[in-house]
Swiss-Prot record:
Source organism: Syrmaticus reevesii
Name of this protein: Ovomucoid
CC annotations in GO: extracellular space
GO molecular function: serine-type endopeptidase inhibitor activity
Domain note: Avian ovomucoid consists of three homologous, tandem Kazal family inhibitory domains.
Superkingdom per UniProt: Eukaryota
UniProt-annotated location(s): Secreted
PROSITE patterns: KAZAL_1, KAZAL_2
Pfam families according to UniProt: Kazal_1 (PF00050)
């Protein structure tokens, strides 16, 4: 089984678009899009990971 990952190297960003392309984090929380997810990854100091694409 391949690990799912997202490149968050260009984050954090000060503002995210409202585009809805959900990602499910390892905290079992659904993030609205890559920007929201990656900002949360940065805030968690890298402890948050991607569980899967789509809603949790």
């Amino acid at each position: 089984l391949a690990a799912v990952s997202v490149d968050c190297s260009e984050y954090p960003k000060p503002a995210c678009t409202m585009e809805y392309r959900p990602l499910c984090g390892s905290d079992n929380k659904t993030y609205g899009n890559k920007c929201n997810f990656c900002n949360a990854v940065v805030e968690s100091n890298g402890t948050l990971t991607l569980s899967r694409f789509g809603e949790c």
